[in-house]
Regions:
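Amphipathic alpha-helical assembly/interaction segments
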Residues: 1-97
Length: 97
């Protein structure tokens, strides 16, 4: 592997972050800086932690630690998506959870 971009998990996380970002822009205006900001940050954190872990892959414990962080960010993102799904009628949310 030459780059983190060769990792399937990174590409999946990157695509999720893009979809979540676009979906978040459909939230009511008053939520763009609250719920919208939080879900954008948590979705981007997934891919960022994968990249940081890849950068430390020489140290197995560090690599694993950042993958655990990525998983935790994924769970946070899913929780945010479930909340948005309950509160608002945005059809793209159902496709993400």
């Amino acid at each position: 592997m030459k780059s983190y971009k060769d990792l399937d998990v990174y590409n999946t996380a990157f695509n999720l972050a893009i979809k979540v970002h676009k979906m978040s822009l459909e939230l009511p205006k008053y939520e763009l800086y609250e719920q919208g900001s939080q879900i954008r940050r948590s979705s981007k954190s997934i891919k960022d932690n994968i990249v940081e872990g890849y950068g430390r892959r020489k140290y197995k414990a560090d690599f694993i630690k950042f993958l655990v962080y990525a998983h935790a960010s994924l769970l946070e993102c899913l929780s945010q998506l479930q909340m948005i799904d309950e509160l608002y009628e945005i059809k793209e949310v159902k496709l993400l959870i």
